[in-house]
Amino acid sequence: LDITFSEQKPSTDTVAANPDGTPFRNADGSLLFRPGGHGALIENLNDLDADVVFVKTVDNVCPDRLKADTVTYKQVLAGLLVSLQARAFAYLEELEAGDVSEERLHEMLQFVEKDLHCHSDAAEALEGLELLDYLYCRLNRPMRGCGMVRNVGEPGGGPFLAYNPDGSVSLQILESSQIDMNDPSKKALFEQGTHFN
């Protein structure tokens, strides 16, 4: 294993805020910047040349007594990811070679929907080259996985179905800051979640 560390880049820092939402200023009047959070790590990920990357931030490092469980579940997640990735790569090779039967295209569509959890009603009606293009776009992209634990009231995001602009529905992790907590129905959905990341 090649284990390295990547620190968040200062260019992704965000302005610190006071409790009332106004920018926090240092004693000299300058703005205080702080690391921007998980989303800011995307830039770091783009710089990596690796098949599998585990992101572990300082707020989710576990004590030594729990490390064995952490290693076990990382191995499970990596095994699942590599297995899904191998199927996706095999399908991509077939799509690139061309001459894929409609039956095989629909098998690939089932994989995208059932195993990659990305559903589109519009895709169900696609055939031939349109379906091939749709599948290629869905398969030719990075894969993400996320460990989940029971929600016991700790802060964190949770698994939600995201309704995307293209009409597809995909499984996504949403943080509380991405949920309109002023909408009682959305707040209730977030609070009733059984698991979080």
Task: Tell where the protein language model's regions lie, with residue ranges.
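Short nucleic-acid-contacting surface segments enriched for D/E, G, S/T with interspersed K/R
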Residues: S185-N197
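Short aromatic-glycine-enriched beta-strand elements
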Residues: G156-L161
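Domain-scale recognition of functional cores that engage charged ligands
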Residues: L1-V152, D166, Q178
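Short, surface-exposed loop/turn microsegments at beta-strand edges and helix-strand junctions
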Residues: N164-S168, F190-G193
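A short macromolecule-binding patch
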Residues: V169-S177
